């Protein structure tokens, strides 16, 4: 179906202002997923089941990692600031499952001031930060980013290419990823919160 987008002003109405109007056309794969329901949750909202440190066992019913860098509570997976006495500065938490089929990964994140984290897509990292402060420069220009508020990232993986958007605004049109691998979250600097992590494999 085809059609136009329109804006209407009724007679006698006050001035109405719009801004940041854009439209993103979906590829066939993404459209198929959006019309086929939500994906499977990667995070149960209560524990770190289904996640692990590399070469370690599934964290199972634990509500936090052994070094305290990751914790689960009330629907939020939190990446916590480092405690130098407990472990290394950089950490990565991985799904125990790997993904070879095309998929759509969706999640919400809320960054603390100057926070630096990342989302690993089959092993390759998409930066997830307090973009307004921590960049990188390419992402400082993102108009839709809401500092210290919830933002939504959607990643559509087709083959070895990922289309990544922030609140509907394109971050990466063709981000290169491996053919197979897990999803990961990085702990680098500051506090980062994630929620509503879901992955829908494309038929």
Regions found by a protein language model. Name each.
Residues 1-203:
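Carbohydrate-interacting regions of secretory-pathway proteins
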